[in-house]
Swiss-Prot record:
HAMAP family per record: CobQ (MF_00028)
One GO process term, biological-process aspect: cobalamin biosynthetic process
Upper classification of the organism: Bacteria, Bacillati, Bacillota, Clostridia, Moorellales
Claim: Magnesium is one of the keywords in the record: no
Keywords for the protein's UniProt record, in alphabetical order: Cobalamin biosynthesis, Glutamine amidotransferase
Descriptive protein name: Cobyric acid synthase
Record function comment: Catalyzes amidations at positions B, D, E, and G on adenosylcobyrinic A,C-diamide. NH(2) groups are provided by glutamine, and one molecule of ATP is hydrogenolyzed for each amidation.
MF-aspect GO terms: ABC-type vitamin B12 transporter activity; catalytic activity
Keyword Chloroplast: no
Domain GATase cobBQ-type: 253-453
Protein family (similarity comment): Belongs to the CobB/CobQ family. CobQ subfamily.
Record: active site: 334, 445
Length: 517
């Protein structure tokens, strides 16, 4: 039977996902077969497994940290918000419908508990250690009766719980004490320790507070993890984009503007771009903030028609088309690709009651939404022309697709040709081009994770500014692995690994054996 440890938080966004990834890497480096698990995840950042299932991006990264192939059992329930108080429900990698919050939490989630149990039982048979991540807070009284993500999961797994608090936002001690007070006595016993996360400052000054916390709660503080703003791992949800609107995420010589759609999804598509030196990437949700960037990207969306209407109301459609008319490059990914076309049809009301809407008319495609959903890992080759794709013709790219509907090319050549979809050999066109190749779009998420393509995009933007190509550009996959080791090393140095091993009943001590420099 697998050993388990569960991370629960005093609230959302306290850093559970990142700490879970760190623990997965620590256990992996100690020679254990380890798997992540999150029973229910609400996020718009998702990915495709090798067998074509959809799961939360955070658990995919945690699986990478654990050195294993991601499986939908690691995240059996995924909720993807489509509008206010409504979400698409994904169960074991497949969509089962859209539900409102009241309907889902009222009774539907209880029907899914057996799927959670089955998924965990599978992982328990396959792995030695399971790192479980909770959702939100275990003390949400209004949802507690029907919750399937926190203490109920801990009981099922027999997992000791570590309660994580974010001290950077303030009130961490009160959050810990308050959370424990609101738990039932039998739940409180399950909490084996406390982790204070995102600390910056003098630890000696914090020590009296830690002593108080241990005395007041009777729970040991297993570690104080430093604030790690540059951990470089994909973030789970768009809450991390709050406060960055209209501002740059860094300084650089070329400027890229990503439109921050209300239902933006898979903004992890831009993680590699943000990591490149000399790139200034910023998120924009007002026409007045768009300015004159070197490149505009329309990202994926969980509500393409709704976000297109928003784009129009904000004046961003006009601003983007004016930039395109002046020669500014435009890229669309998935929902953003659909928006760049001539029109979008939704005859079966997959997204909204709007059956047809005009697009930005910057790409020669028409899109028709369908009830079936494509979720696949894909490989293909570049077929497009123009400055961005022309020099790469014939080169292989890879990524994944997650979309409902199909786009039909009306003129010109496709940007890519898919040669493998979900492990099956295929020959399928993907994407479109216009404006002599300056404007292009694709359904392939992660397209900019491909080093050669991303480097070509940046080199073209630099050349348009009269700047030389930058040597030594990023190897994104190697960088992700390096940053996982750095993260795990930082957590290992500030966490009592001996006490953690004892809490879990491990037979051998935990040490850090990674390469974190």
């Amino acid at each position: 039977m697998a050993k388990a440890i569960m991370l629960q938080g005093t609230s959302s966004n306290v850093g559970k996902s990142v700490l879970a990834a760190a623990l997965c890497r620590i256990f992996h480096r100690n020679g254990y077969r380890v798997s992540p698990f999150k029973s229910q995840n609400m996020a718009l950042n998702s990915g495709a497994t090798p067998d074509g299932g959809e799961m939360g991006r955070a658990q995919i990264v945690q699986a990478m940290a654990a050195g294993v192939v991601p499986r939908v059992e690691m995240n059996p329930i995924l909720l993807k918000p489509t509008a206010h108080a409504s979400s698409q429900v994904i169960v074991l990698g497949r969509p089962v419908g859209n539900l409102g919050a009241r309907e889902y939490h009222g009774h539907f989630n209880q029907k899914l508990w057996s799927r959670v149990e089955e998924a965990y039982a599978f992982l328990e048979r396959e792995f030695e250690i399971i790192v479980i991540e909770g959702a939100g807070s275990p003390a949400e009284i209004n949802l507690k009766a029907g919750e399937i993500a926190n203490m109920r999961v801990a009981r099922m797994a027999g997992a000791p719980v570590l309660l994580v608090a974010d001290i950077d936002r303030g009130g961490a001690l009160a959050a810990v004490v308050g959370t424990l007070e609101l738990l039932e006595p039998e739940e409180r016993v399950m909490v084996a320790g406390i982790i204070i996360n995102k600390f910056r400052g003098d630890l000696d000054l914090l020590k009296p507070a830690l002593d108080f916390l241990e005395s007041r709660t009777g729970k040991p503080v297993l570690g104080v993890i430093p604030f790690l703003p540059d951990h470089g791992l994909p973030e789970e949800d768009s809450v991390v984009l709050e406060g960055v609107t209209g501002r740059s995420t860094g300084a650089g010589e070329v400027e890229i503007a990503v439109i921050k759609l209300p239902c933006i999804s898979n903004f992890t598509d831009f993680d590699a771009l943000e990591r490149e030196k000399g790139v200034n990437l910023r998120y924009v949700e007002a026409a007045s903030d768009l300015g004159n960037p070197d490149l505009v990207i329309l990202p994926g969306s969980k509500n393409t028609i709704g976000d297109l209407l928003w784009l129009r109301c904000q004046g961003l459609e006009t601003a983007i088309k004016e930039l395109a008319g002046r020669g500014t490059p435009i890229i669309g990914i998935c929902g953003g690709y659909q928006m760049l076309g001539k029109e979008i049809r939704d005859p079966e009301h997959v997204e909204t009651d709007v059956e047809m809407i005009k697009g930005l008319d910057l790409l020669p495609i028409k899109t028709v939404f369908q009830t079936s959903k494509a979720t696949n890992q894909v490989r293909g080759v570049v077929t497009g022309s123009g400055p961005f794709l022309g020099p790469l013709q014939g080169q292989e790219v890879q990524g994944y697709e997650i979309h409902m509907g199909a786009s039909f090319l009306l003129d010109g050549r496709p940007a890519f040709k898919i040669t493998s979809r979900g492990g099956r050999l295929v020959t399928l066109d993907d994407g479109a081009l216009a404006g002599e190749g300056r404007i292009w779009g694709t359904y392939i998420h992660g397209i900019l994770d491909n080093d050669s393509l991303r480097h070509q995009v940046i080199s073209v933007l630099r050349a348009r500014r009269g700047l030389p190509a930058r040597p030594g550009m990023l190897n994104f996959m190697a960088e992700q692995e390096r940053r996982l080791d750095i993260l795990a090393g930082e957590v290992a140095r500030h966490l009592d690994l001996g006490r953690l091993a004892a809490i879990m009943g491990l037979e051998r001590p935990l040490v850090w054996t990674g390469h974190d420099n």
